[in-house]
From Swiss-Prot:
Protein name: NADH-quinone oxidoreductase subunit B
Binding, [4Fe-4S] cluster: C72, C73, C137, C167
Stored Pfam families: Oxidored_q6
Domain of life of the source: Bacteria
GO cellular component, one term: respiratory chain complex I
EC supergroup of this enzyme: translocase
Bilayer disposition of the protein: Peripheral membrane protein
GO molecular function, one term: 4 iron, 4 sulfur cluster binding
Organism: Bartonella tribocorum (strain CIP 105476 / IBS 506)
Location within or outside the cell: Cell inner membrane
Biased segments, Polar residues type: 1-11
Length: 193
């Protein structure tokens, strides 16, 4: 949140939302029912919020990922899970089953023979599901781009949300991709997806 300065007074910007054209105020800001409930519950330690904001907050802090390591990028993905980087501090924990995971990290060269397996695993993931494409080979074929047996990017098989470039990308780059995915989830919410 950015603070605006008006001479010597610092004020926060008005909250964003749907504005009533008649009054110029946010819709629901003058609703006595919600004002009374908020006043009654605020001193008891309760927070009144929308369900979408609560779901989005919980989802960004508890992303369960499943690795789909196909080549050398998978080693950097494993390094990201080690204590030096510790991606679990961001709520990004590994899962072995696609039915328990929210994020699939495709790391490495995707061949034509492996593409149906990738799609099958992706279809087993529950909604909302996200895909991080890690490395040049997963992004666009990489070094093997002109080979007859390589898919030129995993986005031809599954929809990709975040691309992490590099050959192989560093663990820091993957962590940055994870943080970008969390930012994307916060921005889009769960209902819009």
């Amino acid at each position: 949140m950015e603070l605006r300065s008006n001479n010597s007074t610092i004020t926060a910007p008005k909250p964003k939302g749907i504005i009533d054209p008649n009054t110029g105020e946010l819709i629901g800001s003058d609703d006595r029912f919600f004002r009374d409930i908020n006043a009654e519950l605020s001193d008891k330690g309760f927070l009144v919020t929308s369900a979408d904001a609560l779901i989005t907050w919980a989802r960004t802090g508890s992303l369960m990922w499943m690795s789909f390591g196909l080549a050398c990028c998978a080693i950097e993905m494993m390094q990201c899970s080690m204590p030096h980087y510790d991606n679990e501090r961001f709520g990004y924990a590994p899962r072995a089953s696609p039915r328990q995971s929210d994020v699939m990290v495709v790391a490495g060269t995707l061949t034509n023979k492996m593409a149906p397996a990738l799609r099958k695993v992706y279809d087993q993931m529950p909604e909302p599901r996200y895909v991080i494409s890690m490395g040049s080979c997963a992004n666009g074929g990489g070094y093997y781009h002109y080979s007859y047996s390589v898919v030129r990017g995993c986005d031809r098989i599954v929809p990709v949300d975040i691309y992490v470039p590099g050959c192989p990308p560093t663990a820091e780059a993957l962590l940055y991709g994870i943080l970008l995915l969390q930012k994307k989830i916060r921005r889009t919410g769960s209902i819009e997806r």
